[in-house]
Amino acid sequence: MVTSTGPEAELAPIEQAKKRAAFACGEKYVQSGCRLGVGSGSTVKYLVEYLKQGFQNGSLKDIICVPTSFLTKQWLIESGLPVSDLDSHPELDVCIDGADEVDGQFTCIKGGGGCLAQEKIVQTAAKNFYVIADYLKDSKHLGDRYPNVPIEVLPLAAQPLLRSIPRAEGGSCQLRQAVKKCGPIVTDNGNFIIDWQFEKNVSGRDWFAIQQRLANTPGIVETGLFIGCVDAVFFAYSDGSVKEIVNSKKH
């Protein structure tokens, strides 16, 4: 048994929510012997904290953690957790990750941290996929909370895609720039990120069709659209509550 103890009161309210969501999901879906895909981002660091507590106190035994990014791998190693990869464990029991936005149809935008391709690869290797998020990620329609769809692209294709994506899909595109280095963000895979700012208030938008068109475009490695893959979302709210919303279409 792992409980969300410690100096939670010292955390900002939004961080408290992230921690509660991570601990609630871990408590329900991570068991001893689990082969677990571990996502990336600020909410996932609390999942790593949960795993560390369980592993150290013996309530979680023989778990295997497959990270979705270099940073997550470092968190796992620093926490003393067993780390593996898809070469050794190509089939996972569970993947748990955060999201930048989740709409009422369980469609997610991910990739704010630039890890979207590896996140999607690990997610597809898992039998079940659970999202952990604070209340600011809960939306009725994509774009209400997060304005862009991140798209990982080959560097060679970046400039043509900055022009062709808006022509085909509307909106506008920007090449994501780094903060502490000159030039664009470079992903763990050595690629660039284009942020597609899609047009809002478009009724009947078919995200699946958009995903298919983008995925079939030469030079695009992967998009931050996660469609039809979420089994449940754990949203933590400012009043201290955590709500699990189960995707009935997958159960």
UniProtKB/Swiss-Prot annotation:
Pathway(s) this gene product operates in, as recorded in its UniProt entry: Carbohydrate degradation; pentose phosphate pathway; D-ribose 5-phosphate from D-ribulose 5-phosphate (non-oxidative stage): step 1/1
A Pfam family of this chain: Rib_5-P_isom_A
GO CC term, one of those recorded: cytoplasm
UniProt EC number: 5.3.1.6
One of the GO BP terms on file: D-ribose metabolic process
Key words, A-Z: Isomerase
Entry keyword Isomerase: yes
SUPFAM superfamilies recorded: D-ribose-5-phosphate isomerase (RpiA), lid domain, NagB/RpiA/CoA transferase-like
Recorded family membership: Belongs to the ribose 5-phosphate isomerase family.
Name this protein carries in UniProt: Probable-ribose 5-phosphate isomerase
Species per Swiss-Prot/TrEMBL record: Caenorhabditis elegans
Gene name of this polypeptide: rpia-1
